[in-house]
Swiss-Prot record:
The gene is ttcA. Belongs to the TtcA family. [4Fe-4S] cluster binds at residues 176, 179, 267. GO terms for cellular component: cytoplasm. GO terms for biological process: tRNA thio-modification. The thiolation reaction likely consists of two steps: a first activation step by ATP to form an adenylated intermediate of the target base of tRNA, and a second nucleophilic substitution step of the sulfur (S) atom supplied by the hydrosulfide attached to the Fe-S cluster. Pfam families: ATP_bind_3. This is tRNA-cytidine(32) 2-sulfurtransferase. It comes from Psychrobacter arcticus (strain DSM 17307 / VKM B-2377 / 273-4).
Length: 381
């Protein structure tokens, strides 16, 4: 049984009439120009892609949507499609399991992916999965109500990881690491059960930058969150389609969409988290130097192993000269006495006798410090 077949049999989502009409007419509306959503041309043909996307989405867009909202949505749509294309995140026939926590990031991810699914030149399925970790006070009815209202196929996976985290993490320590590992393990196993070929997480560009600095400052490593990751057992593929998206745009998008946000009462209530400190630092940088974060993120995509000091990443031990000894002018390692004339004969510059120059001297005639021109000295060969 293929992943797509398994997915179809296990989900029975409800759709409104507008969604059905849009899906029925999808292939009729798809043109060659729409394929530029995943085109790898340098200019990305954004205007053409947006024109076609606007035509497809026109029949379902609300007249009350402001131009400001549509502009922001278009920006996110572009950035997510670029990330999908650049890292080959989603392929034809994929079943994408979107992990929805109830936070702004995962809501935005799900919303944009559903939007792209309707205009993409390839076919892929989306299923939303929420992991109910049994945190005290967790409003377990919020997400199912929202997903049902939107007609989105979904699962609610119930696992009491909260009690485990509380029991194994010492008092005063952060829960994030243990919680993340337990959550990841649960989602990995469930993805295989439903035949999902990709697991989409809602981490954005600023999450990746914060993780980079956390590892740099506290872990002694140059590493972050990759946009695409194969699990250690090679059984699951993680993707982060929001890799190019800034958090401030997600905050604004979630506000305009009025997503029913569910706060994290497990780690969100802890104080003095190192990640929170790093996030504050990044926000201060962004306010004072608007291009700094973009430059740092660009650097993460432009690594020069030979310019660092990781012996596992670059083979420094076997570095050797590739010089032709026949090109040497003289025998021995250094120019010997009596060979200066030979240098002059072949036109190479010859250094004058050693000169001692001290710029901090006083002009005795004027009794004041007078700058003197530094004499030109030919380079020593």
């Amino acid at each position: 049984m293929t992943a797509a077949t398994l997915f179809t049999q296990q989900t029975t989502p409800q759709f409104d009439k507008a969604s059905i009409d849009t899906d029925v007419n999808h292939h009729a509306k798809t043109t060659a120009i729409e394929a530029m959503l995943y085109d790898d041309s340098d200019d990305r043909n954004d205007d053409f892609m947006d024109e076609q996307a606007d035509k497809i989405l026109a029949d379902t867009q609300s007249l009350t949507e402001s131009a400001y909202f549509r502009k922001l949505q278009k920006k996110l749509r572009r950035q997510v499609s670029w990330a999908i294309r650049d890292f080959n995140m989603i392929e034809d026939g994929d079943v994408v399991m979107v992990c929805v926590s109830g936070g702004k990031d995962s809501y935005t991810l799900l919303d944009i992916l559903l939007l792209l699914k309707r205009i993409a030149p390839i076919h892929f399925d989306i299923v939303a999965v929420n992991l109910d970790q049994k945190q005290p006070g967790y409003p377990e009815e919020v997400l199912p109500a929202y997903l049902n209202e939107q007609g989105i196929a979904h699962y609610i996976l119930e696992k009491d990881t909260y009690s485990i985290v509380k029991s194994v993490v010492p008092e005063g320590k952060t829960y994030c690491s243990a919680c993340s590992r337990l959550r990841r393990g649960s989602l990995y196993g469930f993805a295989k059960q439903i035949g999902a070929t990709k697991i989409a997480l809602g981490h954005h560009r600023d999450d990746m930058l914060a993780t980079f600095f956390l590892n740099l400052f506290h872990g002694g490593a140059l590493k972050s969150m990759p946009p695409k990751l194969l699990s250690d057992d090679k059984q699951n593929m993680l993707i982060r389609p929001l890799a190019y998206v800034e958090e401030k745009d997600i905050i604004e998008y979630a506000r305009l969409k009025e997503f029913p946000i569910i706060p994290c009462n497990l780690c969100g209530s802890q104080t003095n988290l190192q990640r929170a400190i790093i996030n504050d630092m990044l926000r201060e940088w962004d306010d004072a130097h608007p291009q700094r974060l973009a430059s740092i993120f660009k650097a993460m995509q432009n690594v020069a192993p030979s310019q660092l000091a990781d012996r596992e990443l670059f083979d420094f031990e076997t570095l050797s000269l590739e010089r032709d000894d026949n090109e040497r002018l003289f025998e021995g390692d250094n120019i010997q006495a009596g060979q200066i004339e030979s240098l002059a004969e072949i036109g190479l510059p010859v250094a004058p006798a050693t000169q001692i120059f001290n710029p901090n001297f006083v002009d005795t005639e004027k009794g004041s410090h007078t700058p003197k021109k530094i004499p030109t000295i030919n380079p020593v060969i």
